[in-house]
A protein has these predicted regions:
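N-terminal flexible/basic segments that precede or flank functional cores
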Residues: 1-28
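Short amphipathic helical patch at the helix-1/turn junction of helix-turn-helix
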Residues: 23, 34-35, 63
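Short basic helix-loop element that most often maps to the first helix and adjoining turn
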Residues: 27-45, 71
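Residues in the helix-turn-helix
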Residues: 42, 53, 68
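Recognition helix of helix-turn-helix/homeodomain-like DNA-binding domains
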Residues: 47-63
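DNA major-groove recognition helix of helix-turn-helix/homeodomain DNA-binding modules
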Residues: 67-82
Length: 86
């Protein structure tokens, strides 16, 4: 099993950290969509992505590609920034 060290010294499974990161990403996208007053269908049309895929993404049942994230961000007038941290 692969573990990573957290800032507080705690060790957690890499798989758990990946799930946490994906959920945080989903939450940020969902928050922006709602702030803009867009439905999932409207966002999908703007991004060229089907509404069911937006729903799957927002429910956490979809592991999105970077291209998917960039399309949705662009449809909301946002940019994607990827950072790597120790």
């Amino acid at each position: 099993m692969d573990y990573i060290n957290m800032e507080n010294g705690e060790k957690i499974l890499l798989e758990t950290q990946q799930k946490v990161t994906i959920q945080r990403t989903v939450d940020i996208y969902k928050q922006y969509r709602k702030e803009l007053g867009l439905t999932q269908s409207e966002l999908g049309k703007r991004a060229g992505i089907s509404q069911p895929n937006i729903t799957r993404f927002e429910s956490g049942n979809y592991n999105p590609s970077l291209e998917f994230l960039v399309k949705i961000a662009g449809a909301m007038g946002k940019k994607v920034k990827v950072t790597l941290e120790d």
